[in-house]
Amino acid sequence: MEALKVEKFTTANRGNGLRAVAPLRPGELLFRSDPLAYTVCKGSRGVVCDRCLLGKEKLMRCSQCRIAKYCSAKCQKKAWPDHRRECSCLKSCKPRYPPDSVRLLGRVIVKLMDEKPSESEKLYSFYDLESNISKLTEDKKEGLRQLAMTFQHFMREEIQDASQLPPSFDLFEAFAKVICNSFTICNAEMQEVGVGLYPSMSLLNHSCDPNCSIVFNGPHLLLRAVREIEAGEELTICYLDMLMTSEERRKQLRDQYCFECDCIRCQTQDKDADMLTGDEQIWKEVQESLKKIEELKAHWKWEQVLALCQAIINSNSNRLPDINIYQLKVLDCAMDACINLGMLEEALFYAMRTMEPYRIFFPGSHPVRGVQVMKVGKLQLHQGMFPQAMKNLRLAFDIMKVTHGREHSLIEDLILLLEECDANIRAS
């Protein structure tokens, strides 16, 4: 058995944590984990396979609930142990669909009732997880009570009373644990496709300037060092989207994870001025418009996404710089819409405008920047811009060999793009 490179320890002021057992290099794989339980997120339901979380145009439905969808009979067969007990519950709740946290907890309970040890709990178990109940406001507690009631209604086909739950299982506390400890599972394009629980990885504390990153290969989690780490040094990840001001980061950390971030970046409001460059009234309007754009994206309404993004971008020409994070997010959405609509020339136009802001906001080796640069290189390759494509594909490789590792499926795709680009350069 491979020796662990990380160990649990008690920090001075942040409770439990993970630290390095020995010196670590950038790109070194520190931990890999399948989830204790996971589920497709609501926005990706019917778009990605419920088992492998990969997108496919034609997915086959579960013949019983007709809600779960799979890319192949093989995935459907592998998914059955996790889906079996929720199947009748999904069928009975139609047309209403449970929140992600409700479906996830249902799967967690099935795993806990199974009583087989899970590799995901090697360092920390579900029962060890922090719930932060004592720190929750009454409004938050009421929200958890509502979730517990929704859960009881959803699982009524399988669980009629507390005797059918694991011993000493507290539903209210379990939901608090799920909210605080679940991981958003992202696909190769860093888009949210699922949510899962990886108990050992819940030991990782937050930093706005982390020394590790997490990426996913389907539901499989990979933790890597992104810079040199000394033996005994605490390992950290960023819990949040990096395109947030210090005030926004602190608020989300306080609301979801119940702690105040006092890191140097938050204390000095690092990069806040860059993020909010431009006319405040205009970027606040764009910030509000992003809610509608994200809603349209969640329903894959790409024509409407693009129309709204273009209207915002055109109306704010010369008034809001691309480095403003809300303008940047609109450019990103416009690029995604163009890619999904097959408008590759327009997609490249928007993508190129994101390159410099991404360099500033995602310094060093960051998976989000690596994927963005790869997208730009791929778009340039498809338009015959071979020297430019080669430059960006190589840059993407340099970043992603650290963040993703050479065995990741996305790196394999990137190597094929590099080979294709090289062949075109040689032939021209």
Curated annotation (Swiss-Prot):
Entry's Gene Ontology molecular function annotations: histone H3K36 dimethyltransferase activity; histone H3K4 trimethyltransferase activity; histone H4 methyltransferase activity; RNA polymerase II cis-regulatory region sequence-specific DNA binding; RNA polymerase II complex binding; RNA polymerase II intronic transcription regulatory region sequence-specific DNA binding; zinc ion binding
UniProt activity-regulation remark: Histone methyltransferase activity strongly stimulated by HSPCA.
Gene that this sequence comes from: Smyd3
Q: Which reaction equation describes what this protein catalyses?
A: L-lysyl(4)-[histone H3] + 3 S-adenosyl-L-methionine = N(6),N(6),N(6)-trimethyl-L-lysyl(4)-[histone H3] + 3 S-adenosyl-L-homocysteine + 3 H(+)
Record bears the keyword rRNA-binding: no
Summary of subunit composition and partner proteins? Interacts with HSPCA. Interacts with HELZ. Interacts with POLR2A; the interaction may be indirect and may be mediated by HELZ. Interacts with HSP90AA1; this interaction enhances SMYD3 histone-lysine N-methyltransferase.
Q: Does the keyword S-adenosyl-L-methionine apply?
A: yes
A Gene Ontology cellular component where this protein is annotated is: nucleoplasm
Zinc finger spans (MYND-type)? 49-87
Compartment annotation: Cytoplasm; Nucleus
Which residues does the annotation say bind S-adenosyl-L-methionine?
R14, G15, N16, Y124, N132, N205, H206, Y239, F259
**Stretch list, region C-terminal domain:** 272-428
SUPFAM superfamilies in the record: SET domain
Q: Which family does it belong to?
A: Belongs to the class V-like SAM-binding methyltransferase superfamily. Histone-lysine methyltransferase family.
Name of the protein? Histone-lysine N-methyltransferase SMYD3
Pfam families membership: SET, zf-MYND
Which residues are modified to N-acetylmethionine?
A: M1
Q: GO terms for biological process?
A: cellular response to dexamethasone stimulus; establishment of protein localization; methylation; myotube cell development; nucleosome assembly; positive regulation of transcription by RNA polymerase II
Report the residue ranges that make up the SET domain in this protein: 4-240
